[in-house]
Amino acid sequence: MGQKINPHGFRLGITTDWKSRWYADKQYADYVKEDVAIRRLLSSGLERAGIADVEIERTRDRVRVDIHTARPGIVIGRRGTEADRIRADLEKLTGKQVQLNILEVKNPESQAQLVAQGVAEQLSNRVAFRRAMRKAIQSAMRQPNVKGIRVQCSGRLGGAEMSRSEFYREGRVPLHTLRADIDYGLYEAKTTFGRIGVKVWIYKGDIVGGKRELAAAVPAGADRPRRERPAGSRPRRSGASGTTATGTEAGRAVGSEEPAAAESATTPEAQSTES
């Protein structure tokens, strides 16, 4: 189940929060439709701005929209002209006063939505999909808060006649663990062969009691007690086959010859001592 469902919806109220915060009784359907229109308006007009997330909060007579972007200069525009235009469009759409907050994303390489958008842009520019996926994984794994990432591309990869899905993964991505902080992003690349869907899952550690675990990852088996080797030498293995020195016919023949040679070597000494 955790492999198929959206990680955000799967963990709502546990480790993730709602992206739209408001209460309505009879106007619930209208507000949901309005939220979808707001997100569609922001995503269609600001493709190059690198929008990672859009949060909407409503009061009785005001709508607050928080835009998390990697390039705030594009959203603000010269002397704030672009921000004023966006605010006017949102007020026309909602019919209420809009408070627009533009927030900068500090680490774009650790945001799943921005990583998916970056891979999709490379696919649109005819970059090989395997190279784009590996480059995104390497950039994300350099971030200290990223413990695992999975990137998946689906569609006519490389212009093939039949569509397929391929993914690369590095580190841990526990999709079925509810306390795991999984960031998820989806973006579509428009190519000459059709659309290619890009999905990204990023694991950022576990959240226990509302706090993220900041302890360093302990290597597997580091806390396991070390067993002391008993005194004496182990039988030597011969080659990569894993056989011991006496595990073959030749080894047993050599082993039987060694005691006879030892007896013949010690017999003269014993005779000299007796005499």
From Swiss-Prot:
Q: What's this protein's function?
A: Binds the lower part of the 30S subunit head. Binds mRNA in the 70S ribosome, positioning it for translation.
GO biological processes: translation
This chain belongs to the protein called Small ribosomal subunit protein uS3
Q: Which PROSITE patterns match?
A: KH_TYPE_2, RIBOSOMAL_S3
Phylogenetic placement of the source organism: Bacteria, Bacillati, Actinomycetota, Actinomycetes, Mycobacteriales
Gene3D superfamilies, sorted: 3.30.300.20, Ribosomal protein S3, C-terminal domain
Question: From start to end residue, where is composition biased (Low complexity)?
Answer: 238-275
**This protein's superkingdom?**
Bacteria
Q: Name one GO molecular function term.
A: rRNA binding
Tell me any Pfam family this protein matches.
Ribosomal_S3_C
What UniProt keywords are attached to this protein's entry?
Answer: Ribonucleoprotein, Ribosomal protein, RNA-binding, rRNA-binding
| UniProt organism field | Mycobacterium marinum (strain ATCC BAA-535 / M)
* Keyword hit for RNA-binding: yes
Give the region (Disordered) as residue ranges: 217-275
The family classification in the record reads: Belongs to the universal ribosomal protein uS3 family.
Cellular component (GO) terms are:
cytosolic small ribosomal subunit
Q: Which residues form the KH type-2 domain?
A: 38-106
Q: What binding partners and quaternary form does the record give? A: Part of the 30S ribosomal subunit. Forms a tight complex with proteins S10 and S14.
